[in-house]
Amino acid sequence: IEDEVGEHPYGVDLIVPAKYEGSDEGGLTVHKIADMIPDAHHEYVNEILEKYDVPELAETKSGQFSMKNDGAAPMSAGTAGPQLEIALAHNPSLVVNALGPPPQFMIDQVKEAGRKVGALAGKAQHAERHVNAGVDLIIAQGYEAGGHTGEIGSMVLIPEIVDAVEDVPVLGAGGIGRGRQMAAAMTLGAQGVWCGSVWLTTEEAETHPVVKEKMLQATSSDTIRSRSRTGKPARQLKSAWTDEWENPETPMPLGMPLQPVLINDAIARINR
């Protein structure tokens, strides 16, 4: 990143949910999570892959994280700690947490390093909890946003959060891809905007070219909030994968982080 942006400021976002399987213990290992997954869900994932003739992975390949070690499960405090250390070894100006208030260790380490810390919020109550935890700014992320998002639209959410947190800076997020939307967010009281999905189609993004093209061709009706990727509602492009998990006669997606562990290799096969 620093090779690309030079001395310009940049930020890093991590995901440590407020609630997830094993959160009371700081997160479970991949092996323990894998042991909790019902056989019916494994069978269903295999049925989907067979239905669409998705090729097997090579023996030397694996998904986003290794299933052969006993490391911390994804999207947990156990994985965020090392990620934070790597981030702070560089020069991000801002570290942001999603799906809950940043853990205290994150706030302490970021502030000790002289950086700012923020958090995404889908409700005014979430924003208030973030401020009480000690964050420096709030990202008010509306229903329209890509990725993990709540159920309140940006037009309503942004002013609610601005009013709730008073003097804490608020960035508006969710459905912001043009200057008009940026102007609207700032008219609602936000001091700036936070964009995510719009960057996935840039030349610098690592997004697969096929996915980039699908995103560029998509309309506002071509997305869905689905738990099929992470176990929590996340907006993504509609696909055969999301269609299969929306079928009421099939198993419901598991919670986080069981669902990511369940589909780890499957997503790698699909992306290939």
Question: How would you describe each model-predicted region?
Answer:
Residues 1-165:
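Active-site entrance/lid segments in N-terminal catalytic domains of soluble metabolic enzymes
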Residues 27-45, 151, 156-171, 177-272:
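Conserved active-site-proximal phosphate/metal-binding subdomains
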Residues 18, 143-144, 175-176, 198-199:
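Acidic, glycine-rich active-site loops and adjacent beta-strand->loop/helix elements
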Residues 99, 173-174:
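Glycine-rich Rossmann-fold phosphate-binding loop(s) that bind the pyrophosphate
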